[in-house]
UniProtKB/Swiss-Prot annotation:
Pfam family, one: IGPD
Keywords linked to the UniProt accession: Amino-acid biosynthesis, Cytoplasm, Histidine biosynthesis, Lyase
Organism: Syntrophobacter fumaroxidans (strain DSM 10017 / MPOB)
UniProt xrefs under CDD domains: IGPD (cd07914)
Pathway(s) annotated for this protein in UniProt: Amino-acid biosynthesis; L-histidine biosynthesis; L-histidine from 5-phospho-alpha-D-ribose 1-diphosphate: step 6/9
Protein family per UniProt: Belongs to the imidazoleglycerol-phosphate dehydratase family.
Chief localisation class: cytoplasm
Disulfide feature: none
Official protein name in the record: Imidazoleglycerol-phosphate dehydratase
Record gene name: hisB
Localization terms from the record: Cytoplasm
PANTHER family: IMIDAZOLEGLYCEROL-PHOSPHATE DEHYDRATASE, IMIDAZOLEGLYCEROL-PHOSPHATE DEHYDRATASE HIS7
Reactions catalysed: D-erythro-1-(imidazol-4-yl)glycerol 3-phosphate = 3-(imidazol-4-yl)-2-oxopropyl phosphate + H2O
GO biological process: L-histidine biosynthetic process
One Gene Ontology term of the molecular function aspect: imidazoleglycerol-phosphate dehydratase activity
């Protein structure tokens, strides 16, 4: 299965202008300019721990708030993943990771099934980390699942520091997605008994 799997999505609305370029078979390099520094930090961790190369540029109505920008980044990242994976032949499909970050621990379990679904079970977080509103994290994940064709279960297992909990979550997302997107040398076709995803 030669070639680097790569997908690019551009989205322009009255609220945002976003370009996402994702290389699944990458080295963990990230070039991020979203205007939302904390999200840049989280997506950099996602890239490093998943060995994904991610280029992301975003302009949004941040004078209102970051909601539209964060959600549309999830849309574009999910769409870029779907494009990069194509028909999903030969991939492992499932991934799971548990990641500690100091006192916090989080798990992400996912299925690249083309059946978008999000389970988000995270303890109550501080309302903000810096200027970033933490209620936007499930909005990001929901959009990512919908446009990436993924079922994703996110669990903040425990922790007291909001930054640490979210950092563990995004690292776990990278590691779980790395597992799920790898090729299984025992399989050449679609990873489903139905023959399609």
């Amino acid at each position: 299965m030669a070639g680097r799997r790569q997908g690019t999505v551009e989205r322009i609305t009255s609220e945002t202008k976003i370009m996402a370029d994702l290389t699944v078979d990458g080295e963990g390099k990230a070039e991020l300019r979203t205007g939302v520094p904390f999200l840049d930090h989280m997506l950099s961790l996602f890239s490093v721990h998943g060995f994904f190369d991610l280029k992301l540029q975003a302009e949004g109505d941040l004078d209102v708030d970051a909601h539209h920008t964060v959600e549309d980044i999830g849309i574009c990242l999910g769409g870029a993943l779907a494009k990069a994976l194509g028909d999903r032949k030969g991939i492992r499909r499932y991934g799971h990771a548990v990641v500690p970050m100091d006192e916090a621990c989080a798990s992400v379990t996912l299925d690249l099934s083309n059946r978008p679904f999000l389970v988000y079970r995270v303890p109550t977080l501080a309302a903000r980390v810096g200027r970033f509103e933490t209620e936007l994290v499930p909005e990001f994940f929901r959009a990512f699942c919908q446009h990436g064709g993924a079922t994703v279960h996110v669990q903040g297992l425990y922790g007291s520091n909001t930054h640490h909990i979210l950092e563990a979550i995004f690292k776990a997302l990278g590691r779980a997605l790395d597992q799920a997107t790898r090729f299984d040398e025992r399989r050449s076709g679609i990873p489903s008994s139905k023959g399609t995803l």
